[in-house]
Swiss-Prot record:
Pfam families: Flu_M1, Flu_M1_C. This is Matrix protein 1. GO terms for biological process: viral budding from plasma membrane. GO terms for molecular function: RNA binding; structural constituent of virion. Residues 165-252 are annotated as: RNP-binding. GO terms for cellular component: host cell nucleus; membrane; virion membrane. It is found in: Virion membrane; Host nucleus. Plays critical roles in virus replication, from virus entry and uncoating to assembly and budding of the virus particle. M1 binding to ribonucleocapsids (RNPs) in nucleus seems to inhibit viral transcription. Interaction of viral NEP with M1-RNP is thought to promote nuclear export of the complex, which is targeted to the virion assembly site at the apical plasma membrane in polarized epithelial cells. Interactions with NA and HA may bring M1, a non-raft-associated protein, into lipid rafts. Forms a continuous shell on the inner side of the lipid bilayer in virion, where it binds the RNP. It comes from Influenza A virus (strain A/Chicken/Hong Kong/37.4/2002 H5N1 genotype X2). Belongs to the influenza viruses Matrix protein M1 family. Most abundant protein in virion. When expressed alone can form virus-like particles in transfected cells. Residues 1-164 are annotated as: Membrane-binding. Keywords: Host nucleus, Membrane, RNA-binding, Viral matrix protein, Virion.
Length: 252
C-alpha cells in the first residue's frame, strides 16, 4: 500500500458516511494525484462544509496544507489553528512538545506513527498545531504519520461507541437505529436508481420505506416492528441490480 493510499484510508475512516464523505474522498484523490493545486480555494471549501467536527476539519486542513504545493508566505487558517490547539489545555501542549522532539528524530512514516500512538488525541492535535503554525518542522512523511496515528485513535473511539450502540439491549435505541438505517438505505437506493425506466420500481420501494419509517415515528410503534426493515430494503435493491445486470452483494 502506498503512503498516500494509507493516509487517505485513515483520514476517511473518521468521516461519517454520506455524500460529503464521497466528496472529500474525491478531493483527497485529486490532491494526492497533483490535480488540485489551489490551496486557498480548497481551504475555503473545507471551512464551509457542514457536519464535520472542528477537529476533523483541522486534520483535513493540515493534510491539504502538507500536500498541496503553495507559496511559502500563505496565511495560516484560523479554523485549522483553533481545531489543533489541544482545547487550550497546557498539559496537551507540554506533551505535544515532547512528542515533537521525538518526531524530529524519526525518519519514516511508520516510525512516526508508532511513536505518536502512545500519546492522547489532544496531545497529537496540539503537535499537529505546532507543525501547522510553523513552530516546528518535520518531514512531510513524519507529519503524515502523525496524522494517521491521530485518525486511528479517533476511529477506535468511534468504533467503541458504535459497538456499544449495536450491542445495546435498550429496545428503544435499537428500534430507532433500525429505522435510521432503513431510511439511509432508502435514500441511497434513490440516489443509485437515478432516472432510468427500470429504476421506477426501486424508487417506489425506497419511497414506501421512507413513508413507513415516517409513519412509525409519527404514531409510535412497538420497538420490534422495525426488525428486518433494512434487510428487506437491501434485498429489493439487490434484486433491482440483478435485473440491471449489476452484481454487487456487499451491502449487508
Amino acid at each position: 500500500m502506498s503512503l498516500l493510499t494509507e493516509v487517505e484510508t485513515y483520514v476517511l475512516s473518521i468521516i461519517p458516511s454520506g455524500p460529503l464523505k464521497a466528496e472529500i474522498a474525491q478531493r483527497l484523490e485529486d490532491v494526492f494525484a497533483g490535480k488540485n493545486t489551489d490551496l486557498e480555494a480548497l481551504m475555503e471549501w473545507l471551512k464551509t462544509r457542514p457536519i464535520l467536527s472542528p477537529l476533523t476539519k483541522g486534520i483535513l486542513g493540515f493534510v491539504f496544507t502538507l500536500t498541496v504545493p503553495s507559496e511559502r508566505g500563505l496565511q495560516r487558517r484560523r479554523f485549522v489553528q483553533n481545531a489543533l490547539n489541544g482545547n487550550g489545555d497546557p498539559n496537551n501542549m507540554d506533551r505535544a512538545v515532547k512528542l515533537y522532539k521525538k518526531l524530529k528524530r524519526e525518519m519514516t512514516f511508520h516510525g512516526a506513527k508508532e511513536v505518536a500512538l502512545s500519546y492522547s488525541t489532544g496531545a497529537l492535535a496540539s503537535c499537529m498545531g505546532l507543525i501547522y503554525n510553523r513552530m516546528g518542522t518535520v518531514t512531510t512523511e513524519v507529519a503524515l504519520g502523525l496524522v494517521c496515528a491521530t485518525c486511528e485513535q479517533i476511529a477506535d473511539a468511534q468504533h467503541r461507541s458504535h459497538r456499544q450502540m449495536a450491542t445495546t439491549t435498550n429496545p428503544l435505541i435499537r428500534h430507532e437505529n433500525r429505522m435510521v438505517l432503513a431510511s439511509t438505505t432508502a435514500k441511497a437506493m434513490e440516489q443509485m436508481a437515478g432516472s432510468s425506466e427500470q429504476a421506477a420500481e426501486a424508487m417506489e420501494v425506497a419511497s414506501q420505506a421512507r413513508q413507513m419509517v415516517q409513519a412509525m415515528r409519527t404514531i409510535g410503534t412497538h420497538p420490534s416492528s422495525s426488525a428486518g426493515l433494512k434487510d428487506d430494503l437491501i434485498e429489493n435493491l439487490q434484486a433491482y441490480q440483478k435485473r440491471m445486470g449489476v452484481q454487487m452483494q456487499r451491502f449487508k
